[in-house]
């Protein structure tokens, strides 16, 4: 099945403690159904000091379920993603506006 959300997409969080926050997808794990969004679902990780790393408390974005994310369309509103065949190629389409993503 084709991916509805991809790396670089602007998304909004629909549920959870970060509801309403917007960000860009930095990585997607389709097999786990999760994505990492910049600035969303931040956790503090304690790292030990080493020669290359200073150590301490480091904020790190954690994965979030794809079902809890919605793509932002050109108007800045959350939209669902559909697919359409154009010129023999399968393209992603915003359901609210019908624009090709």
Swiss-Prot record:
UniProt keyword list: Ribonucleoprotein, Ribosomal protein, RNA-binding, rRNA-binding
CDD domains, sorted: KOW_RPL26 (cd06089)
Any one of the GO CC terms: ribosome
Database matches in Gene3D superfamilies: 2.30.30.30
Gene Ontology molecular function: rRNA binding; structural constituent of ribosome
Pfam family, one: ribosomal_L24
Binding partners and assembly: Part of the 50S ribosomal subunit.
Entry's family note: Belongs to the universal ribosomal protein uL24 family.
Entries under HAMAP family matching the protein: Ribosomal_uL24_B
Function: One of two assembly initiator proteins, it binds directly to the 5'-end of the 23S rRNA, where it nucleates assembly of the 50S subunit.
Entries under NCBIfam families matching the protein: rplX_bact
Protein's name according to its UniProt entry: Large ribosomal subunit protein uL24
């Amino acid at each position: 099945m084709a991916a509805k959300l991809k790396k670089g997409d602007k998304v909004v969080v629909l549920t959870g403690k970060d509801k309403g926050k917007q960000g860009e997808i930095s990585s997607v794990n389709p097999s786990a159904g999760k994505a990492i969004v910049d600035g969303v679902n931040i956790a503090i990780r304690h790292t030990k000091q080493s020669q290359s790393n200073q150590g301490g408390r480091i904020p790190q974005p954690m994965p979030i379920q794809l079902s809890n994310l919605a793509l932002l369309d050109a108007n800045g509103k959350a939209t669902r993603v559909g697919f359409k065949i154009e010129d023999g190629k399968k393209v992603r389409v915003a359901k609210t506006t019908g624009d090709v993503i």
